[in-house]
Structures are given as C-alpha cells and as structure tokens.
Amino acid sequence: MKTAIFTVVLALAVFAVLSFGWEANEEALSEEFTELIHEKEAASETEARECRYFWGECHDHMPCCDWLVCRYKWPITYNICVWNRTFPEK
C-alpha cells in the first residue's frame, strides 16, 4: 500500500515539473512570436511610406507607386492613387 501511494505521489510530482517546464517554454515562444510580429510590422510600415498603394490618398508630398497615378475621383473629396493602365516590364 505504501509503495502504491509513493508511486502516485511521485507521478504527480513528475507531472507538475513537466507541466511547469511546458508553461515556461510556451511563454518564451509566445514572447518570441510577439517580437517577430512587431519586427514585421515595423518593416511593412517603412515600405508603406515609400509610395502610396492602390486607392491610397496622394498629394505632392505623398506620391503613388510607379504603376499608379494620382487622380481626383468624385465623390471622394481628395486625390487617390489609381491604376495608370500600364504593365511593368520584366
């Protein structure tokens, strides 16, 4: 009887240690994933500032991308980037 109780207590202790280690590993992975997402967002923000994409608001200081042109479109009250009907050469 004592051996069975000792085995159960030992098994519970092993499960507790393993689950604690798994939670610590999961938290580290979560933090690493969050940092990676923030890095990707920062990289995409710098790319978005280089030129305005399709239907983006444009002015002299905010140019459209190469395949777009800045046009006034009614009923929108500001200029937007629209396709200039050209295809990029490869």
Swiss-Prot record:
Residues 20-50 form a propeptide. GO terms for cellular component: extracellular region. Disulfide bonds join 51-65, 58-70, 64-81. Keywords: Disulfide bond, Ion channel impairing toxin, Knottin, Secreted, Signal, Toxin. InterPro entries: Huwentoxin-1 (IPR011696). One of its GO terms (molecular function) is ion channel inhibitor activity. Expressed by the venom gland. The keyword Signal applies. The keyword Acetylation does not apply. Residues 1-19 form the signal peptide. It is found in: Secreted. The presence of a 'disulfide through disulfide knot' structurally defines this protein as a knottin. Belongs to the neurotoxin 10 (Hwtx-1) family. 13 (Hntx-13) subfamily. Ion channel inhibitor. This is U7-theraphotoxin-Hhn1a 4. It comes from Cyriopagopus hainanus (Chinese bird spider).
